[in-house]
């Protein structure tokens, strides 16, 4: 067999490389799309739009996620965070591994009763927290070492006590309480 016949029987290297690169790009794009779709299932409120009510109050409308929870994007001390509304939490509860990056310092040791029992926590203060145009200052919070696997911050009653809620279907409207 001569060299010419051998070349014709071998798939062109360039075509094979383009095929491999094409499949890598397709798989990468599918992974990216699937990841964003999953994020939207967990937090359908990533792009909040504030509106003004008939009474002239600023309000934010949240869509319930597929698990039945209200999860939203917000800001703590200027940093973007994911918040899970939790009327059973006394304070805003921040995972310990996120606290330093949010500018929170551990103050007094404390304990909190959770669904998993009593846990050691640290009290702290959040200078600024916002959900859309709803803004809150000097908020009582806790730093929870037991939440380090969580990617959401529990938005507890130390903020929620300042909000009026109206739920209709899968939507929860938040506005500042008078």
Q: What are the residue ranges of the model-derived segments?
A:
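Pepsin/retropepsin-fold aspartyl endopeptidases
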Residues: 1-82, 87-178
